[in-house]
Amino acid sequence: MSRLFAALGKGSVEALTPQTATEAPSAADARPGDYSELVRRLFNRPSAIAVTASGVHGVQTGVCEGIAAELAAAGKQVVVVPVDRLLLTNPIRVIDDLSVLPVVSPNIWVWPSIAQQFEVFDQPPAPSGENWLARLRQSFHAILLDCPPIDSMPGVLELSAMADATLLVVEAGRTTRQQIRKDQLALQSKGATLAGCILVQGR
């Protein structure tokens, strides 16, 4: 177990508590190398990983950025999918034009782009419409689903469960044990594979 990442043992909630999770750097401090062990474990082959915050909105984005930087530094092509944006976009339409926007670092892209938010759903996209994920798998070594807390928007839980594995991001001093347990059980109820927990310090 690295200082960043606690693997789940037999689905035990104990492995998800802040006391047993390991600490990640803040988004501002994240550097290539900080997530090296996590990357070796989860991305030894092309993978789609959901990174979702447990109860605290926004902390998962910094973790996604750190993991993406680690992968990009190793020469892997990475796409980050902001799930809150995807839930406001019709993936059936935008997937035909799989345009992605390069971000600051080489080898990192974002999909869908802000410009592709032209059709708002009355209902969130169903997991059965996962052709967009299959298309991304054809083009990228790593797919990072940047998921807000699973109870913050309809559809987040279902999209998190579509990934090969899910990481829960816990903020020290703010995420409660009860919230972690609730999120763990909700993800497992949808068949999600819980890979571990990352502890971040609050700002």
Regions from the PLM with identified roles:
Residues 1, 5-28:
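N-terminal intrinsically disordered, low-complexity tails
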Residues 8-15, 46, 71, 75, ...:
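Conserved NTP-handling cores and scaffolds of large molecular machines
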Residues 12, 57, 86, 116, ...:
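Surface-exposed, flexible loop/turn segments at secondary-structure boundaries
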Residues 21, 25-28, 36-58, 69, ...:
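P-loop/Walker-type NTP enzyme "switch/lid" segment
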Residues 32:
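Electropositive phosphate-/nucleotide-binding environments in soluble metabolic enzymes
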Residues 63:
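Hydrophobic positions on the alpha1 helix immediately C-terminal to the Walker A/P-loop
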Residues 66, 121-203:
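Conserved catalytic-core segment of NTP-binding enzymes
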